[in-house]
């Protein structure tokens, strides 16, 4: 019965959700400065009579109370991220970004509209269940530090009673993410580590400046940094097991002066990103890079500055909760559940999944080999993903609330 009710309600709201998503896409906002997106979400929460409050950095907490006459203290948390990226959109879609250097290139517009749809469905079905569902609309997810999710946790979003620090936590948390490497309209759920672990590093080699005709009287920062760069390329082969995914990318280099080509510069700098499947590997790579920098600089008598940090942990899916969500997916359509490819992106939902049993599921939007990945200026999204998020979140929440 729930499946058919959810499908019917989803059909009612489909055009509205697509309109919401396109409005958000045309007006992307960065970080925690997302007042237009927040106001649009609140407009529909008001329209559908869903109670909510605003919290730090323009986040929104909405709650739906089941009215079925049973004593059920269970509470499910659903979460969607709302912020865009600092990217200049180069697609040709009619609803492309209207703001230069801002783009929804990670699907957060679909996550937001999809969870709004789940809110609509659950509100319409409030007489059919007991317990509570909390919707968390989160800004600033793209901040790699993960500090915003932690701030929301510190504000009490996981507490059943946010005004009582001694209150018990919500029972379950669920989030979704679109994925281009997963075929369109397929749903993927992993057990355990389900997102990558992002880390970052910066290296500055401090040598001795001098004339390019007398390199023996200098300490050549560029040459030293080049050796460090080359050594970094061998880390994965030498230190990480081949069945454990890892990626090291140099994303920034700087040295010298374009107008002073005859001077060996005192300083040279690179920055990079580390993505690993496991937290221990990220830390190991960070430590190995530090040793490489120290040893190579020591050989040539250079000073250095090295900074490494692991930004956030992997999102971890609870086995029991993921099975319930998988069952909900199969009930909606037994042919759409698949094992997802490895996802190396990070998500600060990890700050929630480390504290309460959680499920983070992937929604396929891939059309073929020529798909542009997330964070591309030509990224495009299959809007069928919106309704899938709505239906899976709402049915999974009802199934979990119904469990003893």
Label every PLM stretch briefly:
Residues 2-104, 113-130:
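Acidic/His- and Gly-rich active-site-bordering loop/insert found
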Residues 24, 78, 108, 135, ...:
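Divalent metal-coordination and catalytic microenvironments
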Residues 27-32, 85, 142-143, 257-259, ...:
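Short, small-residue-enriched loops and turns at beta-alpha junctions
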Residues 53, 134-136, 305:
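A structural signal for isolated positions on well-ordered beta-strands in alpha/beta enzyme cores
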Residues 77-79, 201-203, 360-366:
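Non-cysteine beta-strand/loop elements that form the S-adenosyl-L-methionine
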Residues 85, 93-103, 109-110, 116, ...:
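Histidine/acidic-residue-rich, glycine-tolerant segments that coordinate divalent metal ions
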Residues 223-404:
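Metal-dependent amide/peptide-bond hydrolase catalytic core
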């Amino acid at each position: 019965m729930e499946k058919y009710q959810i499908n019917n309600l989803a059909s009612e709201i489909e055009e509205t959700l697509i309109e919401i998503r396109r409005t958000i896409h045309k007006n992307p906002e960065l970080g925690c400065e997302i007042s237009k997106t927040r106001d649009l979400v609140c407009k529909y929460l008001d329209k559908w009579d869903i109670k909510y409050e605003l919290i730090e950095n323009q986040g929104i907490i909405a709650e739906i109370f089941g009215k079925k006459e049973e004593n059920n203290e269970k509470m499910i948390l659903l979460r969607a991220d709302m912020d865009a990226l600092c990217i200049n959109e180069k697609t040709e879609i009619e609803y492309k970004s209207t703001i230069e250097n801002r783009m929804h290139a990670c699907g957060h517009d679909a996550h937001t509209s999809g969870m709004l749809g789940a809110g609509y469905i659950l509100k319409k079905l409030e007489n059919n269940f007991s317990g509570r569902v909390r919707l968390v609309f989160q800004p600033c997810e793209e901040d790699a530090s993960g500090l915003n999710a932690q701030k929301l946790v510190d504000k009490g979003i996981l507490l059943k009673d946010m005004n009582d620090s001694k209150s018990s936590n919500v029972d379950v948390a669920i989030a979704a993410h679109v994925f281009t490497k997963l075929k369109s309209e397929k749903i993927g759920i992993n057990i355990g580590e389900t997102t990558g672990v992002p880390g970052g590093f910066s290296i500055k080699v401090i040598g001795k400046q001098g004339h390019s005709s007398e390199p023996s009287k200098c300490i050549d920062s560029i040459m030293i940094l080049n050796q460090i760069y080359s050594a970094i390329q061998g880390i994965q082969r030498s230190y990480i097991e081949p069945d454990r995914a890892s990626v090291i990318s140099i994303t920034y280099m700087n040295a010298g002066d374009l107008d002073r080509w005859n001077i060996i510069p005192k300083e040279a700098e690179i920055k990079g990103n580390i993505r690993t499947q496991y937290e221990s590997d990220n830390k190991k790579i960070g430590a190995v890079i530090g040793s490489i920098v120290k040893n190579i600089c020591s050989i040539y008598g250079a000073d250095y500055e090295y900074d490494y940090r692991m930004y956030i942990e992997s999102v971890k899916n609870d086995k029991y909760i993921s099975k319930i969500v998988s069952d909900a997916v199969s009930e909606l359509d037994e042919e759409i559940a698949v094992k997802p490819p490895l996802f190396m992106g990070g998500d600060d939902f990890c700050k929630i999944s480390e504290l309460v049993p959680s499920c983070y599921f992937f929604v396929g939007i891939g059309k073929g080999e020529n798909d542009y990945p997330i964070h591309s200026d030509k990224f495009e999204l299959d809007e069928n993903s919106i309704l899938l998020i709505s239906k899976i979140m709402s049915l999974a929440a009802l199934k979990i609330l119904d469990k003893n």
